[in-house]
Regions:
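A short acidic, Gly/Pro-enriched loop at the edge of an enzyme's catalytic core
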Residues: 108-118
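Local beta-strand N-terminus motif with an aromatic residue
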Residues: 35, 114-115, 123
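Class I SAM-dependent methyltransferase "Motif I" SAM/SAH-binding loop
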Residues: 39-46, 123
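Gly/Ala-rich phosphate-binding loop of Rossmann-like dinucleotide-binding domains
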Residues: 53-54
Length: 207
């Protein structure tokens, strides 16, 4: 799976990248609360990082492909301070920090303590089922208790596209995050891939 993402970035096949802040985030960012340390797993070079920072949050991202991290800071004309760790390279500029490396090796100590909120548009849907089962428990170790989460998922007929992004059913979200309190904020047709007949969903979850 790791080689897949390195290949996609190297070949410029990044149709999953959104050039503007995600519409679910724009509408429901208030679910995260004010002035939080927000964890953004598998963040790529998402505009969402800048958007969250503009709202007064301190943003902690993690991205496997270091070239994507470099591209994010270069495209926003930010000159980051760079620190090498055992398994990650840390890039920090202002209120945005991104760790280049394996998300599953991220620790609370490395990121300066547990984060206070979570925004996930691209992480859960990027992982195959066997990794999704590991993702939620690991993510909880990086957060304070009862942290608010804004989650964006897609559901479509997996036979029509191999993924990633993978289809994540509503029932699976409820199973992965049980017994956390959760609300389905919105469900709408996936306008980016209408040929799949899929659904975009946004969730507010208290971890």
């Amino acid at each position: 799976m790791d080689s897949f993402w390195f290949d996609r970035w190297r070949e410029g096949q990044i149709g999953f990248h959104e050039g503007t802040p995600n519409s679910h985030l724009s509408q429901y960012a208030g679910e995260l609360g004010p002035g939080k340390r927000v964890l953004v797993p598998l963040c790529g070079k998402a505009e969402d990082l800048v958007f969250l920072a503009s709202l007064g949050h301190t943003v902690i991202g993690c991205e496997l492909v270091e070239d994507a991290v470099k591209a994010f800071f270069a495209e926003h004309q930010l000159t980051p301070a760079i620190t090498s760790h055992a398994h990650h390279v840390q890039y920090t500029a202002g209120s945005i920090t991104v760790f280049a490396g394996d998300y599953f090796e991220l620790t609370p100590g490395l990121i300066g303590g547990p984060c206070e909120a979570l925004y996930d548009r691209a992480a859960l849907v990027a992982l195959p089922p066997e990794l999704r089962a590991r993702y939620a428990p690991h993510t909880r170790t990086l957060l304070v208790a009862h942290a608010p989460m804004l989650l964006v998922t897609f559901e479509y007929d997996q036979a029509l596209m191999k993924g990633p992004p993978f289809s994540v059913r509503e029932a699976e979200v409820r199973e992965i995050y049980a017994p956390s309190a959760m609300r389905l904020l919105e469900e709408r047709p996936d306008a980016r891939r209408p040929e799949l007949g899929g659904l975009d969903r946004s969730w507010a979850i208290t971890l």
